[in-house]
Amino acid sequence: MIAVLLLVFGMTPDYIFPVSADIPVVPNFDAQKTVGKWHPIGMASKLPEVPEYEQKISPMDHMVELTDGDMKLTANYMDGVCKEATAMLKHTDKPGVFKFTGGEIRMMDIDYEKYLIMYMKKSTFEAMYLSARGSDVGDDIKEKFKKLVLEQNFPEAHIKYFNAEQCTPTAA
């Protein structure tokens, strides 16, 4: 019964939906170097249909801040009007691995000045994301992303690249 309640509320323990130890993590990951603005370039999901919330939030610029090793991600997204969403990623004892309610993020590959490739697993959704400091990356980085996506057994047809207009919420 507890497992059912945890599933309903999105707080799934690792033993129910474990993240594979085979997912690579950047050695010597330095969270401080990720602070600042990141532009989403692309994503891949294991599902043919991306959940509605992910469709809205994934293509939007993300701002990264750090507090005591935890990452605060802030993104603006369109939902009729421009809104802001914030997520807290709690650091773990393994650099480059972060937990959030109902899931985990692993930093798979990074050039702190250019791009970031990360893996996210929730109880009902698995995805990989490519973000960049600028509004685009070269074909070599897109190929690296594609290679990592395929190595994690994501379907190639589920890779998509963004071309989204950004928004800024108006002050209340």
Swiss-Prot record:
Tissue: Secreted by the epididymal epithelial cells.
Major location (coarse): secreted
Alphabetic keyword roster: Disulfide bond, Secreted, Signal, Transport
Gene Ontology CC entries for this record: extracellular region
Disulfide bonds: C82-C167
InterPro entries registered for this protein in UniProt: Calycin, Lipocalin, Lipocln_cytosolic_FA-bd_dom
UniProt xrefs under Pfam families: Lipocalin (PF00061)
Compartments reported by the entry: Secreted, Extracellular space
Signal peptide location: 1-21
Example of a GO MF term: small molecule binding
Domain of life: Eukaryota
SUPFAM superfamilies for the chain: Lipocalins
Recorded family membership: Belongs to the calycin superfamily. Lipocalin family.
Function of the protein: Could transport small hydrophobic molecules into the epididymal fluid during the sperm maturation. Binds to the head region of spermatozoa and plays a key role in sperm maturation.
Protein name as it appears in the record: Epididymal secretory protein 4
Organism from which the protein derives: Zootoca vivipara (Common lizard)
